[in-house]
From Swiss-Prot:
It comes from Staphylococcus haemolyticus (strain JCSC1435). One of its GO terms (biological process) is cell redox homeostasis. This is Bacilliredoxin SH1401. Belongs to the bacilliredoxin family. It holds the Pfam family Disulph_isomer.
Length: 145
């Protein structure tokens, strides 16, 4: 049996993109798109997506379920580490004081990083832990919807 690795990975990436987009996150694929969103006033939750197991098993489900809450960011966006490299690097430029990490979440307010949930706060935790961390950020920085 001959398995085409690129074809397989394209399917994995497409599924990961669709999963987060179906949860209501806008995919940013260029540096210009990142700047256009993150320079706006208000709050933006950035999910740095990836194909690793903790992204699919923990981060993306948490990103979706955390939205069933009274307080929410103004915008939900995602960049894909290892896929949309320009957009991911541009987003990471906003994450001042934090090392590159994927999967991860960053809450940006008025163009500045407030806090970040890094991979080490996701990997090895259960989905509910990450939901609670996200909703804690929403409580602290976001308005009721």
């Amino acid at each position: 049996m001959d398995l085409n690795f690129d074809l397989y990975m394209n399917g994995v990436v497409e599924q990961a993109r669709n999963e987060i987009e179906n949860a209501g996150y806008e995919q940013l694929t260029t540096a210009d798109e990142v700047d256009k969103v993150l320079q706006q006033n208000g709050t933006s939750l950035v999910m740095v997506n990836s194909v690793c197991g903790c992204a699919g098993g923990i981060a993306r489900p948490a990103a979706s379920h955390a939205l069933h809450y009274d307080k929410l960011p103004d915008r939900l966006v995602t960049v894909f580490a290892g896929q949309d490299k320009e957009a991911t690097q541009q987003a990471r430029d906003y994450f001042e004081g934090y090392a590159p990490s994927s999967p991860s979440f960053a809450l940006i307010k008025d163009g500045k990083i407030t806090e970040m949930i890094e991979r080490h706060q996701i990997e090895g935790h259960d989905v509910m832990d990450v939901i609670n961390q996200l909703q804690g950020l929403f409580d602290k920085y976001c308005d009721e919807r």
